[in-house]
Amino acid sequence: MERMDIIIWLLAVVIVLTTLMIFLHLKTLKIIRLLFPVSKELSKKSCVFPWKKKWTKNYPPSSMYP
C-alpha cells in the first residue's frame, strides 16, 4: 500500500510540473537554457535537426516551384 501511495504522489507531482511547463513554457525554456548551455550550443550547430540543412541544400524553394 505504501508503494502505491508513493506512485500516486509521484504521478501527481509529474502532472503538476507538466501543467506548469505548459502554462509557463517561455519562462521554463529560458531556465532550461540557463541550466543547460550545451543544448543551446547543439541547437546553434543544428546537430539536433540535421535534416533541415540537407533539405534546404538539396531542394531549394526555387526548384520546388518552377
UniProtKB/Swiss-Prot annotation:
Cysteines joined through disulfide linkages: none
Sequence positions bearing N6-acetyllysine: K54, K57
Modification N6-succinyllysine occurs at: K54
Compartment annotation: Mitochondrion membrane
Keyword rRNA processing part of the UniProt annotation: no
Transmembrane segments: 8-24
Membrane topology: Single-pass membrane protein
GO biological process, one term: ATP biosynthetic process
Keyword Transmembrane helix: yes
Keywords associated with the record: Acetylation, ATP synthesis, CF(0), Extinct organism protein, Hydrogen ion transport, Ion transport, Membrane, Mitochondrion, Transmembrane, Transmembrane helix, Transport
Cellular compartments per GO CC: mitochondrial membrane; proton-transporting ATP synthase complex
Family: Belongs to the ATPase protein 8 family.
Record note on quaternary structure: Component of the ATP synthase complex composed at least of ATP5F1A/subunit alpha, ATP5F1B/subunit beta, ATP5MC1/subunit c (homooctomer), MT-ATP6/subunit a, MT-ATP8/subunit 8, ATP5ME/subunit e, ATP5MF/subunit f, ATP5MG/subunit g, ATP5MK/subunit k, ATP5MJ/subunit j, ATP5F1C/subunit gamma, ATP5F1D/subunit delta, ATP5F1E/subunit epsilon, ATP5PF/subunit F6, ATP5PB/subunit b, ATP5PD/subunit d, ATP5PO/subunit OSCP.
Role: Subunit 8, of the mitochondrial membrane ATP synthase complex (F(1)F(0) ATP synthase or Complex V) that produces ATP from ADP in the presence of a proton gradient across the membrane which is generated by electron transport complexes of the respiratory chain. ATP synthase complex consist of a soluble F(1) head domain - the catalytic core - and a membrane F(1) domain - the membrane proton channel. These two domains are linked by a central stalk rotating inside the F(1) region and a stationary peripheral stalk.
Name of this chain's protein: ATP synthase F(0) complex subunit 8
Gene expressing this chain: MT-ATP8
